[in-house]
């Protein structure tokens, strides 16, 4: 008998974090992210708190990560501005236990004061971004985010949007697998970002992103479907659902890891289609990077940078 359930995207993120063995969750409420923390608080194995603000939530999660346990911070897009200081520094110092930062963007400005794109912040902070396209991926990608965090020694942003956070889909829950806490090691050069240490860690961060971009060409999180090659679409997140509905016969490169981008995979896909279209809500983050590689593509000349699609 199937144990499938219908879950909100945010509920599925909480489930994925639980299954990944998260022990600490800190958040500041704000639509469309609130239900992540509300749902993870239902699991007795997880310490969950509403923090005074997003910066404190980030610092709680970073502290738990450095102590060796898997941890998560959750907030909406404008909350990431408040949490920027510890996030940027943690990008340099890295993690001990896996650290995932769930950030919910709000295309269409349903409950926010602006329409900023978290991918732009992540690019500046040099932090990788994972973006699911439905509730089941929200569960699975959250688990992958913790694996990537520990493998590459980095915080990982899980980006969602209002439409994904508040829509429901079929989810296939799995058992919780709780890895042993990692031993905390006193490491001044890695954990304390004084100038003498930060200079060396900046080099590490640049090399980390380069390595991750190379590995992304073979990651299960990025998928290619070749159908009619007269049109090829590169897309990610909830926009993938719109592409499937509007262009069911098109070839599609669906990116689960949206920063850093898999250059070799994208170039290979572009070479096999006649016309390349990039479909992404809000800023032309993917489009600008693809065009910087000399690839001809359409994107924001066809679609707006405002609102939902």
What are the roles of these predicted feature ranges?
Residues 2-10, 132-309:
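Flexible, low-complexity linker and terminal segments
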Residues 1-135, 226-227, 285-287, 292-309:
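Thiamine diphosphate
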């Amino acid at each position: 008998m199937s144990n499938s359930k219908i879950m909100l995207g945010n509920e599925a993120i909480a489930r994925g974090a639980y299954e990944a063995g998260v022990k600490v969750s800190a958040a500041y409420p704000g639509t469309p992210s609130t239900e992540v923390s509300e749902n993870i608080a239902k699991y007795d194995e997880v310490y969950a708190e509403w923090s005074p603000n997003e910066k404190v939530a980030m610092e709680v999660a970073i502290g738990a990560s450095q102590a060796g346990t898997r941890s998560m911070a959750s907030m909406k897009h404008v909350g990431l501005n408040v949490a920027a200081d510890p996030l940027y520094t943690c990008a340099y110092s890295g993690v001990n236990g896996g650290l995932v930062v769930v950030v919910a963007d709000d295309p269409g400005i349903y409950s926010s004061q602006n329409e900023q794109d978290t991918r732009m912040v992540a690019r500046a902070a040099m932090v990788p971004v994972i973006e699911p396209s439905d509730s089941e991926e929200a569960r699975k990608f959250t688990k992958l985010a913790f694996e990537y965090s520990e493998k590459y020694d980095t915080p990982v942003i899980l980006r969602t949007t209002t439409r994904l956070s508040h829509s429901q889909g079929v989810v296939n829950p799995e058992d919780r697998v709780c890895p042993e806490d990692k031993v905390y090691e006193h490491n001044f050069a890695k954990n304390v970002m004084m100038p003498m240490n930060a200079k060396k860690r900046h080099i590490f961060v640049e090399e980390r992103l380069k390595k991750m971009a190379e590995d992304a060409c073979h990651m299960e999180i990025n998928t290619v479907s070749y159908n009619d090659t007269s049109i090829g679409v590169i897309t990610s997140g909830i926009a993938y659902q719109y592409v499937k509905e509007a262009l069911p016969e098109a070839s599609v490169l669906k990116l689960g890891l949206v920063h850093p981008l898999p250059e070799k995979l994208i170039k290979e896909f572009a070479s096999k289609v006649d016309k390349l279209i990039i479909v992404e809500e809000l800023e032309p983050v993917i489009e600008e990077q693809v065009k910087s590689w000399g690839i001809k593509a359409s994107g924001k000349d066809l679609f707006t940078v405002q609102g939902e699609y």
